[in-house]
From Swiss-Prot:
The gene is RAB8A. A motif (Switch 1) lies at residues 31-45. InterPro entries: P-loop_NTPase (IPR027417), Small_GTP-bd (IPR005225), Small_GTPase (IPR001806), Small_GTPase_Rab (IPR050305). Phosphorylation of Thr-72 in the switch II region by LRRK2 prevents the association of RAB regulatory proteins, including CHM, CHML and RAB GDP dissociation inhibitors GDI1 and GDI2. Phosphorylation by LRRK2 is required for localization to stressed lysosomes. It is a lipid-anchor. NCBIfam families: small_GTP. It is found in: Cell membrane; Golgi apparatus; Endosome membrane; Recycling endosome membrane. Its cofactor is Mg(2+). It comes from Bos taurus. One of its GO terms (biological process) is cilium assembly. The modification Phosphothreonine is found at residue 72. Its main location: membrane. This is Ras-related protein Rab-8A.
C-alpha cells in the first residue's frame, strides 16, 4: 500500500503528573477537551498527520506518565524521539521547578540533537497562576529552547506548539539532507526562508 505521508516524526510529551500533558495531546489530536482524564499509566500515543511546506508529516506523539514509578519505562522512549515537549502547569510552582530535572533526563537518555520546547500549560487559569510568563521565557532562554504558554481547555497555542516543533524538526532534517548531498548535485533539499529556525514567543491571551 502506498505511503500516505512524506515524513514520520516521533514526538514525546514529558513533565510532572497532572500538568495536562494528556489534555494537550487530546486537544491536538482530537480537537477536544476532557477534564476527567486519569493519570497516564506508563505510556500512550496518538497520531495526527499535518501538512508543512507542501509535505505531509505524520506525527506520532507519545504521552508519558509523570510519576516516578514509571520513569524507567518512559525514559526508554526518549531515544527515538525527534522532538520533546516539556510541560509544566503555570498554577503549580513545583512542576515548573522540576523542568530542570526533566531536561537532565533528556540530556541523559535522548539524542543529542533532539528538538525541545517548553510549554507552560493551563494559562487560562490566570487567577491561580504561580509561575509568571517571564520566568518561563527566561528558563527557556537559559537552555536555548523555544517557549509557549498553552491552554488545552481554552485551545490556546496548542496547534502553534506542535506545528512549530514539527517545522523545526523538518528544517533540521532538510539541512542534514542538504549537507549530505554531493557537491554540485541538484538533489539537495532547498530550504525556504520560512523553514529556518525562528524564535517564537506567543502571548497567552484568552479571547
Amino acid at each position: 500500500m502506498a505511503k500516505t505521508y512524506d515524513y514520520l516524526f516521533k514526538l514525546l510529551l514529558i513533565g510532572d503528573s497532572g500538568v495536562g500533558k494528556t489534555c494537550v495531546l487530546f486537544r491536538f489530536s482530537e480537537d477536544a477537551f476532557n477534564s476527567t482524564f486519569i493519570s497516564t499509566i506508563g505510556i500512550d500515543f496518538k497520531i495526527r498527520t499535518i501538512e508543512l511546506d507542501g509535505k505531509r508529516i505524520k506525527l506520532q506523539i507519545w504521552d508519558t506518565a509523570g510519576q516516578e514509578r514509571f520513569r524507567t519505562i518512559t525514559t526508554a522512549y526518549y531515544r527515538g524521539a525527534m522532538g520533546i515537549m516539556l510541560v509544566y502547569d503555570i498554577t503549580n510552582e513545583k512542576s515548573f521547578d522540576n523542568i530542570r530535572n526533566w531536561i537532565r533526563n533528556i540530556e541523559e537518555h535522548a539524542s543529542a540533537d533532539v528538538e525541545k520546547m517548553i510549554l507552560g500549560n493551563k494559562c487560562d487559569v490566570n487567577d491561580k497562576r504561580q509561575v509568571s510568563k517571564e520566568r518561563g521565557e527566561k528558563l527557556a532562554l537559559d537552555y536555548g529552547i523555544k517557549f509557549m504558554e498553552t491552554s488545552a481547555k481554552a485551545n490556546i497555542n496548542v496547534e502553534n506548539a506542535f506545528y512549530t516543533l514539527a517545522r523545526d524538526i523538518k528544517a533540521k532534517m532538510d539541512k542534514k539532507l542538504e549537507g549530505n548531498s554531493p557537491q554540485g548535485s541538484n538533489q539537495g533539499v532547498k530550504i525556504t526562508p520560512d523553514q529556518q529556525k525562528r524564535s517564537s514567543f506567543f502571548r497567552c491571551v484568552l479571547l
